[in-house]
Amino acid sequence: MADIEELKFDAEVGKVLSLVVHSLYTNKDIFLRELLSNASDACDKLRHEFLSNHDLMEEGEELKVVISVDKDSKQLSICDNGIGMNRDELIANLGTIASSGTQRFLEALGGDKAKGYDLIGKFGVGFYSVFMVASEVVVDTCRAGESVGYRWRSSGDGGFTIEKLGEDVPRGTKITLTLKEDESGFLDKFRIEHVVTTYSDHLGYPVYFLDEKGEEEKLNSGIAIWTKPKAEVTAAEHLEFFRSVAHIGSEPWMVIHNKNEGAIEYTNLLYIPSVKPFDLFHPDRRCSVKLYVNRVFITEDNVQIIPQYLRFIRGVIDSSDLPLNISRETLQNNRIVEKIKTSVTKKVLSALKEKAESDHESYSKFWENFGPVLKEGLCEAMDTESREGVLSVCKFHTSACAAGELVSLADYISRMKPGQESIFYLSGDDLESTKRSPQIEKLVSSGIEVILLVDPVDDFWTSVVSEYKGVPFKSVMRVGEKDLEKCIGASDDSGDKTSEDSGESASDKESIGSFIEYLKKVLDGVVSDVRVSKKLTTSLVCLAVPDNSMDIRMERFLREQKQLNYKGNRILEINIDHPIAKSLLKEHEARGESELLNGIVHLLYDEACIIEGEEIRSTVDFASRINGVLAKIFSSK
């Protein structure tokens, strides 16, 4: 008798098994879909390895999957003649899961059973769905090119055994399930056929049912739907294929199906989901488009067939111009792959632009899901044409937009005021507070539209993208007097002028000048400059930065990430028409410098910092100054 090794599942697999068996699925048909998908992958891998080793199979041999049942023993078997597994692969594939992946799966599930359908396939745990219906699972397998087979057996109770078989085990894998008492329905041929045609009809390999007479009946069409003419692919076929490649239970938001017959021949069948994939913001930023060569699966790992900022796309790209024996390593810098990537990217951006122009409501939902990811592309190295292609499909909230409304850059430029030379934008933590920021008061009151940026990625792309269609971007934090004069002088009919613009007397100007110099003296070493604000109308103070300085939010992020160890220059702007500013000016005229007034000046700077989300220098000093002002107020009553 052959030696039998008794092994334990790793700890996280045990948790997954418990979820799968007791609570995860409401649709148990899924286990068969998972097994058929695995069998198809095994055939794909054999075909790929056969390209470099013709001893692995006979030339022209049919790769297939065969389903059979034994009603007396209550056993269901799924057999493929694909790549097979050796002992180490059995343990690696069926005994362990990468702990990080499993933990993410468990955290993602978070007690919500309904999420299981969408998440199970993403973390390599689909095989374990067999234990929903099986009391015992036996896997007999032999690796292509090897002569020794192995048997893996488990009841899903925490462990498994590995047994070495003889040398007459056929290449491939046979999975035999002993079904639970109440799962005998899966022995019915018609139910099996329904599951196959529902979930696996698109597989590139025939799936047969072996009847009692030993005859094989084909259950699936075996058609790769991306090879069919675009007009002949039905909505039902798209839905089925999308769910199989995306592991998402919803419908696709957009289908992009093209056959390119130019200098490079390829077919793409791509789907944009209507919901966010779970792994959208995974640190690896992995893309999930499968690369085929003449219907032979090559890889979906370690190759950037689409840019990372389009990683929400699912589907396949099939090319006849790549060699069948291309290795995954040489794909990295392959000229044809790069050309396909460039071409596909243009097709996707073109489709998005057309959708954005024709269906604003639908596109707004897409943008809510994937806008931040798409904007990541603006941070990547690309030529001007490519960057403008991404910018052309971007949508933004602005100071002039109603709730939920988005505008394109083309829309914004078409609404620019006479004399306005820049696309004004302001970054903030959230839409509501950014829309109320003191920074944009004068611009908004003068009818100048400001783009409001609230995604973390916005601070990055605005530091590398300087213009769109020849119109420069300019942060409101850097807007100065000249910028305002150019655009507001032609568009401001409100009569809202500052004291310096309203014909104040020479003595008034002198008093204001003296007061500003006083503020500079008190805040020397704290700010690089103090100036009368031209962009405040109702607020007292705000911060600004010099033209060539980094935006405050970006600088703060880099400091938090320990990538920056200094604080850039700040400019304090004060609204000299504000009642408090007027009172401080009078106090300075009447009494000059005082300890109380000095404290209030520091409070003005602290207020400006708080508005911008900046840390104040000393909470102790801040509290002391507040108390000093309050004491003065109440002692005078």
Swiss-Prot record:
Upper taxonomic classification of the species? Bacteria, Pseudomonadati, Pseudomonadota, Alphaproteobacteria, Rickettsiales
Tell me the function of this protein.
Answer: Molecular chaperone. Has ATPase activity.
> What PROSITE patterns does UniProt report for this protein, alphabetically?
HSP90
GO CC, alphabetical: cytoplasm
Q: Which organism is it from?
A: Anaplasma phagocytophilum (strain HZ)
Q: Where is this region: Disordered?
A: 488-508
The record's annotation in SUPFAM superfamilies points to:
ATPase domain of HSP90 chaperone/DNA topoisomerase II/histidine kinase, HSP90 C-terminal domain, Ribosomal protein S5 domain 2-like
* CDD domains with a match to the protein in the record: HATPase_Hsp90-like
| Signal peptide span | none
- Family, similarity comment: Belongs to the heat shock protein 90 family.
- Protein name (record): Chaperone protein HtpG
- Region entry A, spans: 1-328
A Gene Ontology molecular function term of the record: ATP-dependent protein folding chaperone
> Per its UniProt record, what Pfam families does this chain match?
HATPase_c_3 (PF13589), HSP90 (PF00183)
Residue segments, region B: 329-556
Provide the protein's localization. Answer: Cytoplasm
Primary location: cytoplasm
What spans are recorded as compositionally biased (Basic and acidic residues)? 494-508
Q: Which keywords appear in this protein's UniProt record, sorted alphabetically?
A: ATP-binding, Chaperone, Cytoplasm, Nucleotide-binding, Stress response
Q: What do we know about how this protein assembles, alone or with others? A: Homodimer.
Annotated spans, C? 557-637
